[in-house]
Amino acid sequence: MKKLLVKNIGLLATPEGKSAHRGEEQGKIKFLKNAWVLIEDGIIASVGTGAVPAVEGAEVVDAEGHLVTPGLVDAHTHLIFGGWRQNELGLKLHGASYLDIQNAGGGIQSTTNATRQASEQELAAKASKALDEMMGFGTTTVEAKSGYGLATEHELKALEVIKDLNDHHRMDLVATFMGAHLVPAEYKSNREEYVRLVCEEMMPKVKEQGIAKFCDVFCEADTFTVEESRQVLEAGLKYGLRPKIHADEIEAIGGSQLAGEIGAISAEHLIVCPPEGIASMAKGGVIACLLPATSFNLGAVFAPARDMVKAGVPVAMATDFNPGSCPCLNMQFVINLGCLEYKLTPEEVLTAVTLNGAAAIDLADKVGSVEEGKLGDLVIWDAPDLDYICYRVGSNLAKTVIKRGEIV
């Protein structure tokens, strides 16, 4: 049995439980001073304070009085893609909007072209490098979407890459099928046929492949309507894929209301989410997966996070790592923005990037808190307390990252 003992933890900060926290519960964090954590064969065996137990054969890590939290959970990424889109920066600086760039042949379609041309090996190598960087910032679990293939062969290829990464990289990954990311150029004059392709051809093969756990759709002006999104998500449910939905990122066309109606596990973005959307999500038990770094990169407003907390909607936060609207893979920056722009407390933010993020990908029983029986995923921070990592913008404060009981 492999054992790792983390001792001399100045302050251990963790949410507790195996489900998402909402309302006042979102800000409830357990703090333990002078703590220790014992991990056996990758699983947390015990957590305590005071005298450190003598554990025969254990590797000992001295936290040197620093802060320790659960490993961070990045519950929304577009990890698998070819190329980059730095050429769009100048267009943005001259006033082009996200939809302007997309409608001119850039945006998602540009990345789709590059992704289709890339081999599985090329996509895996690129994504593996990104995962290394993510882990260096304290992320230990990642959701990864397909969605830059937009053809059956290439969507399945992206999901195979995610499986390969999950099998061979230290990071734990969960796959989401997102064939409904955009109507590709070859179907612009026949979008109904593309929706049919996603629902009737891609979905059965995704189920047969057995990699994806979720189905996502981009419900937005100039992408997929509410009814098209409903059609996609209902087809996903038919094939055993739990629904997620990109909603209210640019225009509020009803995506957040659909999330509540269909019982989505999470709704993403929600930058311009209206009160009726918040109410629908609260009623439907939907987790709001907010992406503040995307607002930052787009120069957009920030999602009404406080209104969601007040309404009893569980709030998670993630990077939205992608080559266009958010080439950011640093969850520490997400933490900073959660406090500075959403005005969430450090405690609410910690829950958002750990337990609620885990719940948004149906892993709250395995990760997201430092508790007996969960995976031994920890971050030792170069910080004395939780406030410090929220207020120190622009520095990597992850001193030591531990994944399944092993030092990364």
Region locations from a protein language model:
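N-terminal metal-binding scaffold of metallo-dependent hydrolase/deaminase domains
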Residues: 1-54, 386
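Non-catalytic positions within long, well-ordered alpha-helices that form the structural scaffold/packing
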Residues: 135, 199, 207-208, 237, ...
